[in-house]
Amino acid sequence: MGRVRTKTIKRASKLLIEKHYPRLTNDFDTNKRTCDKLAKIPSKRLRNKIAGFCTHLMRRIANGPVRGISYKLQEEEREKRDNYVPQESAIKTNEVKIDRDVEEMLKSTLEFPTIPQIHVVDQKRYNKNTKKSNK
């Protein structure tokens, strides 16, 4: 079973990733040296634990967004996705096909005006008695 990480280690790692994301990598040794330069960590053992958890989180971030950690690159990607407007609409309203029953219903209830995009199509009725042969 793995070792339990304290709140201090998790908090410190989270802050380091949020503030210095581009400097950290998936390699423990480089993260250890980076943590040493960026923060004043009182002991070697604590520094190694923080660097190890940073490495763990960086590997998780590579797979996808991690809950509780927000860094600038991730926020920019999220904004791009939210503000994306397609060139052509997915819902094309060039032509809408309706059958005679729907047309009558629209005219009677809504006093529906004639719109050029709406085309009335004869609907073929489904016959229950016809059977398909399996030949």
UniProtKB/Swiss-Prot annotation:
Is the Signal keyword given for this protein?
no
Q: Which organism does this sequence originate in?
A: Dictyostelium discoideum (Social amoeba)
Q: Which family does it belong to?
A: Belongs to the eukaryotic ribosomal protein eS17 family.
Question: Which GO MF terms does the UniProt record name?
Answer: structural constituent of ribosome
| Keyword Ribosomal protein belongs to the record | yes
| Entries under Gene3D superfamilies matching the protein | Ribosomal protein S17e-like (1.10.60.20)
The record's disulfide annotation reads none
**Which GO terms are recorded in the biological process aspect for this UniProt protein?**
translation
Recorded GO CC terms? cytosol; ribonucleoprotein complex; ribosome
What is the protein name given in its UniProt record?
Small ribosomal subunit protein eS17
Which NCBIfam families does its entry note? PRK01151.1
Q: Which UniProt keywords apply?
A: Ribonucleoprotein, Ribosomal protein
